[in-house]
C-alpha cells in the first residue's frame, strides 16, 4: 500500500485541511514542538492543527524536533511530547526528529532509545525521522532496528536499505496555494496502532474482568432479544397454541423471543404437529 501524507508545523501557518483532503492527502504528521519540556518550545499551531485534522476526518501523527545531546535531555523531550499529547494516541505514531547539526556528535543511539522507549511505555507507537545520510551513518545501529523509520530523501526513489514505513520524498508539494513536505506511507498505521491498543487493553484484563465483560455482553444480547415482538411469520401459530393452552407466554401476556431456539419457533412446530 502507498498512502499520501504531509507533515506540518507552525511554519506552514494556517493550514486548510479541507484543501488537503480534496487533493488526496490521507494523513498529516504534526509538529509537537522542539527540544526540552518548556511551553515556550511548543509548536504554536499544534493544538489547532489537531482540531482541524480531526474535523476533516484525517488521521494524524506527531513529531518532536530534537536537540538532545544525552539521555537526560531526551527524557525531557519525551515529557514534552507526552504533555502535549495529553493521553491521545495518534494513528500515525509519534516520531523523534533527529537532524539538527548541534547534536551531530551526541550519543544519538542513546537519545533515540530513551525517547522511543518513553513513548512505548505510554502505549504509543514510536519511530525515528532522519535524513538518509544520518540513518545510514550516525543512526545505523542494530539497537535502533526495532524502531520504525521515517526517511527524508528528496528524490525519485527511496534508497534506504533497511525497512522503513514512511518516505518524505519532497519539500515542494504544492496544495491550495501552500507548500508542504510530501510523504508516502507504506504501512496501514491506523490499523496497526488500533490493533496495538486492543492488545494492550486485553493484556491488562484479569480473568474476572473477562468473565464480567462476557456476562454483560450476554445479558445485553438477551435483553435486546426479549424486547423483540413476535415475527409476522409466527403470529398465527402463536395465537393458535396460546388459545389451546399448548404454551404460555410471558407474565404480561406478551410472547417475545427469549433464546437461540425461540418460543415462537417452538409454537410453529407444535402448530404443525397438533
Where do the model's predicted regions map?
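Short beta-strand/turn micro-motifs composed of small residues
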Residues: 64, 130, 153
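Aromatic-lined carbohydrate-recognition surfaces of secreted/lumenal glycan-active proteins
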Residues: 123-136
Amino acid at each position: 500500500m502507498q498512502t499520501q501524507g504531509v507533515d506540518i508545523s507552525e511554519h506552514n501557518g494556517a493550514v486548510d485541511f479541507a484543501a488537503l483532503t480534496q487533493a488526496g492527502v490521507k494523513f498529516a504528521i504534526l509538529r509537537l514542538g522542539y527540544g526540552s519540556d518548556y511551553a515556550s518550545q511548543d509548536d504554536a499551531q499544534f493544538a489547532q492543527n489537531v482540531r482541524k485534522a480531526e474535523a476533516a476526518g484525517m488521521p494524524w501523527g506527531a513529531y518532536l524536533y530534537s536537540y538532545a545531546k544525552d539521555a537526560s535531555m531526551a527524557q525531557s523531550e519525551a515529557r514534552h511530547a507526552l504533555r502535549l499529547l495529553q493521553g491521545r494516541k495518534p494513528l500515525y505514531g509519534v516520531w523523534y526528529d533527529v537532524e539538527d547539526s548541534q547534536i551531530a556528535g551526541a550519543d544519538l543511539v542513546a537519545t533515540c532509545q530513551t525517547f522511543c522507549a518513553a513513548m512505548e511505555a505510554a502505549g504509543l507507537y514510536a519511530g525515528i525521522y532522519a535524513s538518509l545520510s544520518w540513518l545510514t551513518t550516525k543512526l545505523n545501529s542494530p539497537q535502533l532496528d526495532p524502531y520504525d523509520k521515517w526517511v527524508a530523501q528528496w528524490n525519485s526513489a527511496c534508497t534506504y536499505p533497511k525497512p522503513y514505513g514512511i518516505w518524505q520524498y519532497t519539500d515542494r508539494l504544492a496544495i491550495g496555494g501552500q507548500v508542504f513536505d510530501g510523504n508516502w506511507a507504506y504501512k496501514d498505521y491506523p490499523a496497526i496502532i488500533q490493533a496495538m491498543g486492543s492488545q494492550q487493553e486485553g493484556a491488562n484484563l484479569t480473568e474476572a474482568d473477562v468473565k464480567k465483560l462476557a456476562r454483560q455482553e450476554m445479558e445485553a444480547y438477551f435483553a435486546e432479544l426479549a424486547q423483540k415482538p413476535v415475527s409476522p411469520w409466527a403470529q398465527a401459530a402463536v395465537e393458535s397454541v396460546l388459545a389451546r393452552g399448548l404454551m404460555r407466554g410471558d407474565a404480561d401476556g406478551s410472547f417475545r423471543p427469549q433464546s437461540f431456539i425461540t418460543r415462537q419457533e417452538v409454537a410453529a412446530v407444535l402448530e404443525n404437529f397438533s
